[in-house]
C-alpha cells in the first residue's frame, strides 16, 4: 500500500524500534495521527529531552542525568560490593526489589563470538580498573541466564579468581534464556538471595 510520504516516514521510524514490524508500525503511526496535537508534541519533546539530557555514568555505566549517577554518589550504599549486569535496564530491575544496597557495573552487552562481540567490546576493562580499589570485596555476577550471559560470567570469574575477591553468581530463579528486566521483584529477590560462589 502506498502511503503519503509523512506517514511512510513515520512508519519507517517506528520500524527502527526493536520488536516493531511493519504491521505494528502502521498501527502506531495511525494511532499517533489520531492523538491530540499537544499530546504528540509532548511525546516528541520527551523523546528529544531524553536523548539530549541522558548519558552514561562515568563510574558504573548506568544511564543518568548527572555524572556520577545517584547510585554511585550515595554514600549509604555498600561500597564493598559490585553487582555486574549487562544493561542499564537490569539496574532498574534490581533497584525495584529494594533489597540490594551495593554498587553496580553495567557491561553494556555480553560476550558473543557469533555476533563478533569479545570481552574488549564491553565494559570489562572498566570493571577491572574499578576493582583495583581495595574497598571492593565481593562481585556479584548478575548477567542474564542465557548462553552469552553465562559465557560473560565465566570469563569474568576466571579473570577475577586470582584476585581473592569473593565472586558469586545470582541463582537461577530466573528462567534460562530470560532477561533480568522482565523478572518480577520476588523472582529477582530469590535469585539474589540464592547467589552462588564461583
Swiss-Prot record:
ZnF (C4-type) residues: 57-72
Q: Which GO terms describe its biological process?
A: DNA recombination; DNA repair
Q: What molecular function terms (GO) are annotated for this protein?
A: DNA binding; zinc ion binding
Q: Which domain of life is it from?
A: Bacteria
InterPro entries this protein is in? DNA_Rcmb_RecR (IPR000093), Rcmb_RecR (IPR023627), Rcmb_RecR_Znf (IPR015967), TOPRIM_dom (IPR006171), TOPRIM_RecR (IPR034137)
Q: Does the keyword Metal-binding apply?
A: yes
State the PROSITE patterns in the record: RECR, TOPRIM
Return the Pfam families for the record: RecR_C, RecR_HhH, RecR_ZnF, Toprim_4
Record key words, sorted:
DNA damage, DNA recombination, DNA repair, Metal-binding, Zinc, Zinc-finger
**Segments forming domain Toprim:** 80-175
Q: What does this protein do?
A: May play a role in DNA repair. It seems to be involved in an RecBC-independent recombinational process of DNA repair. It may act with RecF and RecO.
What NCBIfam families does this protein's entry cite? recR
UniProt similarity note = Belongs to the RecR family.
**What is the protein named?**
Recombination protein RecR
Q: Which organism is it from?
A: Bacillus pumilus (strain SAFR-032)
